[in-house]
Amino acid sequence: MSLIEFPLLDQTSSNSVISTTPNDLSNWSRLSSLWPLLYGTSCCFIEFASLIGSRFDFDRYGLVPRSSPRQADLILTAGTVTMKMAPSLVRLYEQMPEPKYVIAMGACTITGGMFSTDSYSTVRGVDKLIPVDVYLPGCPPKPEAVIDALTKLRKKIAREIIEDRTLCQSQKKNRSFTTRHKLYVRRSTHTGTYEQELLYQSPSTLDISSETFFKSKSSVSSYKLVN
């Protein structure tokens, strides 16, 4: 049996007969055999590759990496997702059979990371394209954090209800492309030259007069704490 706790698998008789439901039995079989589709585009994926070694041994969780989305039920996105890659990612997700799950690994996947401030081609979060079940922050996350994310996903699968999963399948048309990105053509601000007014400022803006300095210092020293 798995180490994941089940709400309905704790009723045993004196003859060691386990009373359960088909829903719990289905969840137990699925959480012990997750087949991930690895979608790594940056350095975060190297941390996930560390799980394959003997130190962490991710085979004990029943993970079998697949190269085809039609044979996978978990997609693990790691790294930056660009606008050009977005249609391919959504197509891979749509080709996965139900039920399917998503783990967003790393800051670049969750929020765009350091590329989200001045890059016009970076998707600000993979959840704008596909629904995410577990968020794994970090830059990059450690292998122990990846194992913790997999454990949380297994607990989520263990408590799923078939009716809720059927409702999500009926609303499949709303599960992807939740937010449309709008691109506007504007004048480029990266000209390759430095702003001279920022480098050579007048002394009046850089220097602080001694009178102002001692005035602020005396005001700080005269402040008293009141209990």
UniProtKB/Swiss-Prot annotation:
Give GO BP annotations, semicolon-separated: aerobic respiration; electron transport coupled proton transport; photosynthesis, light reaction
- Which UniProt keywords are present, listed alphabetically? 4Fe-4S, Chloroplast, Iron, Iron-sulfur, Membrane, Metal-binding, NAD, NADP, Plastid, Plastoquinone, Quinone, Thylakoid, Translocase, Transport
- Per the entry, which co-factors are needed? [4Fe-4S] cluster
One Gene Ontology cellular component term attached to this UniProt record is:
respiratory chain complex I
**Compartments, record wording:** Plastid, Chloroplast thylakoid membrane
Self-association state and partner proteins as the record states: NDH is composed of at least 16 different subunits, 5 of which are encoded in the nucleus.
Q: Which family would the database say this protein is a member of? A: Belongs to the complex I 20 kDa subunit family.
Recorded protein name is NAD(P)H-quinone oxidoreductase subunit K, chloroplastic
Q: What is the lineage of its organism?
A: Eukaryota, Viridiplantae, Streptophyta, Embryophyta, Tracheophyta
